[in-house]
Amino acid sequence: MSFSADEAAHRAASDAEQIAWVDEQDNLLGAIGRAELRERGLIGRGTYILVFNSAGDLCVHRRTLSKAIYPGYWDVAAGGMVQADESYAESAARELEEELGVRDVALHAHERFFFDQPGNRLWCAVFSAVWDGPLTLQPQEVLEARFIPVAEVMRETEHKSYCPDSLAALKRYLASL
């Protein structure tokens, strides 16, 4: 897999980042490097921010090929791993600004759930926001982004690769409406 030196450096820094390590009940156990957490099959915390525009369309974005998990997949949520020293809400605000350039927007907290797949074991916190402003994409993590109707997103999941963890977050959000 080929990616830029900038993406490679970003990936190395991301793998070394100290993130929250938790147990099956979401109790904080300590801090651990992201790559080590994955390698050892431990559980972390993740945030999933569903960004809608005022027309109700959902922002989907394509992940870069340098991502450790689901490279090149489409994603229905901004978000990422919760750092060791931050809350779910702090992580959501940070990730939303980093990935899409969205800041100073009301984040609405929804449910938390446990996602368990080999190499991706997370307590997930779902948030939503409404944003009609411009998007500023983080080139080391996001290749492209667009707003599309939720029904179209669900159709696309039948023939395009979408991240299963963020899809689980979206489905739980939709079921709660």
Role assignments for model-derived ranges:
Residues 46-78:
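A glycine-rich, hydrophobic loop/mini-helix early in the fold
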Residues 13, 75-76, 137-141:
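Short glycine-enriched loop/turn motifs at secondary-structure junctions
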Residues 59-60, 77-109:
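The catalytic Nudix box helix
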Residues 2-5, 33-35, 84, 109-114, ...:
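Nudix hydrolase/Nudix homology domain
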Residues 3-48, 54:
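Acidic, metal-coordinating catalytic segment for phosphate/diphosphate chemistry
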Residues 40-42, 69-73, 148-149:
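A short, polar/proline- and glycine-enriched secondary-structure boundary/capping micro-motif
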Residues 28-31, 56-62, 134-138:
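Short, well-ordered strand-loop elements centered on a beta-strand within folded domains, enriched
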